[in-house]
From Swiss-Prot:
Effect ascribed to mutating K84A: Total loss of activity
Protein name, as recorded: Perakine reductase
Residue numbers binding NADP(+): S205, P206, I207, G208, R209, G210, L211, F212, A213, G214
Single biological process term from Gene Ontology: alkaloid metabolic process
Species the sequence originates in: Rauvolfia serpentina
Amino acid sequence: MPRVKLGTQGLEVSKLGFGCMGLSGDYNDALPEEQGIAVIKEAFNCGITFFDTSDIYGENGSNEELLGKALKQLPREKIQVGTKFGIHEIGFSGVKAKGTPDYVRSCCEASLKRLDVDYIDLFYIHRIDTTVPIEITMGELKKLVEEGKIKYVGLSEASPDTIRRAHAVHPVTALQIEYSLWTRDIEDEIVPLCRQLGIGIVPYSPIGRGLFAGKAIKESLPENSVLTSHPRFVGENLEKNKQIYYRIEALSQKHGCTPVQLALAWVLHQGEDVVPIPGTTKIKNLHNNVGALKVKLTKEDLKEISDAVPLDEVAGESIHEVIAVTNWKFANTPPLK
């Protein structure tokens, strides 16, 4: 497993991370605790040391608690824990973010307790509170770094202006953002800005919310999956998007790998500073994901793969309408007065 630097502040992680969200049932049924811990331990055995969670995953922070229990069976000092705060409310009416200093601190304390750790390696603002100047939120995070409660600061779904202003208060180590073969809207402005500032990029949903795994193509999704209402997985949109999958499937045969491995390898090849965090509940899928690291792609290969997924042919928005307003395009904050 290759190791890379995220950001310029010294954080070193495995080139492939692991997203823990799905273990607590945010996509399908939650795994029994022992099975969830077994998946995390096997990820570590495969060389993955960078684990991603959030205070909003599972019920009442249960995903952080699960990771915390797994950490008790692993060498803590060899693991980089990334967790997130800032989603204050989530429901049918949408998502409300909160970035006030007292909320920042209380979330950090609660995450430390649930994870049962002395420090958090990477603490992200999960979604941007557009009512609070980002300098205010970052100021409190800077204090938490100085106190040793967190080591590095990250942003998620932040706009270019917010990234610049946050980074001016305290160095931002990583930006977590959706990035995959069929969601590439960060390439024009966000990626160059992160590189200019020395901020690592952590793509979530790097295999297209599972599209390139093929389950939604070859069989019907489980009724309880959140994807059954996702714009890209319903009705005519899914029928159109199946063609994208079939093109990647054909290219994967040429490269002697699975469609998932090709889609993930494409993301991994976007730069040393790009560390995707795919998640899964199954050991065999975990091994399949790790296998993407063996797929070597040339510049010509990367272009051919990109061209097989013309963005104007992708049917449906990348996120549910109710949470679209929390996307990076709407994540500016008021000026500091």
